[in-house]
Amino acid sequence: QGFLNGFIDLIAAGKNGRVCVIDYKSNHLGSRLADYGQAAMSEAVSEHHYYLQALIYAVATARYLKQRRALPESIHVRYLFVRGLNPHGQEGLWCWDIPVSALQEWLE
């Protein structure tokens, strides 16, 4: 009975059919690259309910795509923690690949 309001920063589609939902996060997890490792980012994702946000964004993206083309096997959600991005490592990049089959009940 309510409404949600939000914005997906970027949806990227590759030639191979891969679809990525990209959201930029400005959370301050520390002042060192090491502070933006997988454990710290996962803690922030949990603490700020970003798992729920990822699911909502994945459902919204799948609904949009379903009207326009074949659905991919997965929606690849990427949170870019911009304060900790490292072009030479995985710091600052949080990933969750959500199978579209897990979203089916919300796509009907």
Region spans (language model):
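Structural signature of nuclease core domains in nucleic-acid processing machines
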Residues: 1-108
